[in-house]
Amino acid sequence: MKAALLIDRGVLRVAGDPARHFLHNLVTANVETLTPGHARYAALLTPQGKIIADFFVVEAPADDGGGFFIDAPKALVPDLVQKLNFYKLRAKVTIEPLYALAVLAAWDGIGATEYGLDYRDPRLPALGQRVLLPPDVATEAAADLGAELVDASDYEAHRIALGVPRGGVDFIYGDVFPHDADLDKLGGVDFKKGCFIGQEVVSRVEHRGTARNRIVPVAFDAHAAEDGVAVTAGDKTVGTMGSSAGNIGLAMLRVDRVADAMAAGVPLLAGGIPMKLREGAIADFLKDPKA
């Protein structure tokens, strides 16, 4: 079992009696049915349905003050606090950043620790679990879990191998819809919960099957192409390269154009380097461009 302190993650807290209802009406996940010690992968969208931030909503135990922790990209925490405060209106909720907390990820096994609040990563079982804790006890928490404490780059390689996108790296906040970033494939959108900000646009894409962009696992014969370079098929641009580790990576691709290229036997190139699609945890939609 391995564990890594994710220095790019931050934590905020939403508390108060209306906190559950408040979050449920805003984010893409179902917060009403969330139980203490468990998490939901979710996003806050613009009214036009584009992702402002993706994060985990974790219900705090009652003996820890209740409410909800939000495990989010650290760089987005101040803006997320501001945005949630904008939406709270007269709701009697408090929204505050918890700069004393960090996030530890653990995988290749499941353990338990008394050094923080641990929960299973709701996106994929293979992603293991996460722990909200003060960063200075990361070593003790890893030992408690029975895990070897490794560098965050090991976790990145594991994430990329599973084909799981990372916000701000594999997709740009404010530019993409949930389907573009595979949130629907990773349990990040509850299509049965009813209204949330941007819900009409997202539901329309889901029911019409009109998602054009997807983030997919890719591979190279040697080292992967650099983040941000164009992916081409012949003289057409079909996507953009994202994060990578060794000879594997992720790329945001126009699924219809890739399907056409594959049918015509046209090779894919990323920054001029031959690239192929690989079998991954969330690549099945490539078999059906309408997925």
Q: What spans do the regions from the language model cover?
A:
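Acidic, proline/glycine-enriched N-terminal capping motif
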Residues: 1-53, 61-65
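Glycine-rich, small/acidic residue-mixed loop/short-helix segments
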Residues: 181-189, 203-291
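Acidic, low-complexity central loop/insert segments
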Residues: 3-4, 10-11, 56-165, 233, ...
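Short amphipathic alpha-helix segments
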Residues: 43-48, 104-115, 222-234
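Short glycine-/aliphatic-rich beta-strand segments at the starts of folded cytosolic domains
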Residues: 5-26, 94-108, 210-220
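Short, conserved active-site entrance elements at the starts or edges of catalytic domains
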Residues: 151-152, 158-184, 221
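Short, intrinsically disordered, mixed-charge
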Residues: 24, 28-32, 78, 82-90, ...
